[in-house]
Regions:
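Short active-site neighborhood of thiol/selenol oxidoreductases, capturing the structured segment around
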Residues: 67-96
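Thiol/selenol-based redox catalytic cores and closely related redox-interacting motifs
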Residues: 137-203
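Non-catalytic interaction/Regulatory regions outside core domains
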Residues: 4, 40, 123, 135, ...
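A generic structural motif
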Residues: 58-60, 186
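Short, small/polar residue-rich loop motifs at catalytic or cofactor-binding pockets
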Residues: 51, 75, 178-180
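Structural microenvironment flanking redox-active thiols in thiol-disulfide oxidoreductases
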Residues: 92-145
Length: 220
């Protein structure tokens, strides 16, 4: 099966936004990405070799999914995304959906985590035809344990609100906090073998790199 060129799709989406969005909004988003690059405490985020925290979270169907149960079946890919309102997140989720047969060949499974309410997670799963677990991390509790959470500045709060993307209504809390997009590969002994953390939400872990990490793990 051909692997989706996620990097190319993300770049095309970025160019389309720059072409069609108001110049002031494009400049605002660019400046806030650079600001986050300098202020985000990357050293505090979990990295390769760290032990992943145990967690249990509600899924989009009303059940509960635990990392420990998933690890009993093999390696787990855990990806933190901002929410179904983010088009870059949706591109990533669709590309990872297409990877599921390859993941299964390594005995691996996928968990996607965002701070949005379960109803919003269900909408995301249905709209994007996702068959892996889409989990709701209310209050960013698990993302915080991974060291990924940051608050949005007022300008971004205003911009999202004006675009009908007010986070308090989507996430069910007034914190205006999000996780930095990140993808981890976690081994059955709960160790992190790959950590991809990127403050620029327009960049995500390429499917090819994810498969390479699983391949490397399979032969070690």
């Amino acid at each position: 099966m051909a692997v989706i060129d996620l990097d190319r799709q993300l770049q095309e989406l970025r160019k389309e936004f720059a072409r069609t969005a108001p110049a002031g909004r494009v400049a605002l988003y660019e400046s806030r990405i650079e600001e986050l690059r300098s202020t985000f405490a990357r050293h505090a985020a979990l990295k390769e070799g760290d032990r992943a925290p145990a967690f249990s979270l509600p899924d989009a169907q009303g059940g509960t999914v635990s990392l420990s149960a998933a690890l009993k079946q093999g390696p787990v890919v855990v990806t933190f995304y901002r929410g179904g309102w983010c088009p870059y997140c949706n591109l990533q989720l669709r590309s990872y959906q297409a990877l599921l047969p390859e993941l299964a060949s390594f005995g691996a499974s996928m968990l996607a985590i965002s701070p949005q309410l379960p109803d919003a997670s269900l909408s995301t799963a249905e709209r994007e035809a996702l068959t892996f677990n889409v989990l709701s991390d209310l209050g960013n509790d698990v993302a915080r344990q991974f060291g990924l959470v940051y608050p949005l500045p007022q300008e971004l709060r205003d911009a999202l609100s004006s675009s009908n993307k007010a986070l308090p209504s989507i996430n069910g809390d007034a914190s205006w906090e999000l996780p930095v997009p990140a993808t981890y590969v976690i081994t059955p002994n709960q160790r992190i073998s790959l950590a991809f953390i990127e403050v620029d939400y327009r960049q995500r872990l390429a499917p090819q790199r994810l498969l390479a990490a699983l391949q490397e793990q399979a032969v070690t």
